[in-house]
Amino acid sequence: MSREQEVLRRSIFVTFIIAGIGVGFGVVSGSSSVIFDGIYSLTDASMTVLTLLVARLIAAGGVGRHSKLTERFNMGFWHLEPIVLGLNGSMLMGAAIYALITSIGSLLSGGHDLEFGWAILYAAIVVVAGCIMANYGHRANRSIGSNFLVLDVKAWIMASAMTGALLVAFIFGWLIQGTGLEWMSPYIDPVALMVISTAVIPIPFSTVKQALADILLVTPPDLRQHVDEIALRQVEKYGFLSHRAYVARVGRGRQIEIYFIVPTGGAPRRLEEWDRIRDEIGEEIGGEGPDRWLTIAFTTDRAWAE
């Protein structure tokens, strides 16, 4: 099991526990925001399970090149990563939008009462757990560099922020009991839910945007510039006429195709010499490993490069 998968498994385990606690405490306290918090965690945990499966597939594709699985998907599994990331981010945004609509409806209907003691206990537990898991995932990802873990850490930060705001609201509601401000109690839960859901809706947007760009194979400008600079140096060094480069980033994978236009009637080279040039270009591009798909071709016919 890779380090990435280990971190995701622990995140899933803790998230499912928090989700169960959230739904239970939400029912006992009568808090819609706590129930939403639990359902939100459950949604996140379910998507993290899918994320873990995809991470395993990508790892298996990089190691077992001749397995039955890679025979059916011999171009790799990179394309699954942006799909899962986009789906995950979209579902988290959708859950927050639904919570916002629910909170507005509750406000318009006069709010509702709840047991602040149970709600405060739940919120305190989740805030502590969320901060611990966010820090754990962030520290682990320093050496891993996984987009999956980036999104998982964002989810923990979102959960901690949401529940932290709930904790403040619940403590305020508990403190005003028996005072002249007690009339505000029924509105605390829906107002807290409305504020939190509004704040977290845009957080997964950048992840969804990047996932969509990967799915559509939008050319990354930085990668394209890097490849073009290297290819231009090779054109000048070996006397080629020009080159054509095609690049894309799909999840953690980089797909690079370079076609060099060679002069017609040039001096013949042994195949070993062409391979040496390929190796030289590959070393300059960098990132050699299972997450780089590099194709380098030489031709005298421009039509093959277009």
Q: Where does each model-flagged region fall?
A:
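Alpha-helical transmembrane segments and adjacent TM-loop junctions that form the membrane-embedded core
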Residues: 4-10, 33, 47-306
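The first (N-terminal) embedded transmembrane alpha-helix
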Residues: 10-22
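Short, hydrophobic transmembrane alpha-helix segments
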Residues: 24-37
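Active-site cores that bind ATP or allylic diphosphates and position pyrophosphate for catalysis
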Residues: 40
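Alpha-helical transmembrane segments and their membrane-interface boundaries
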Residues: 43-44
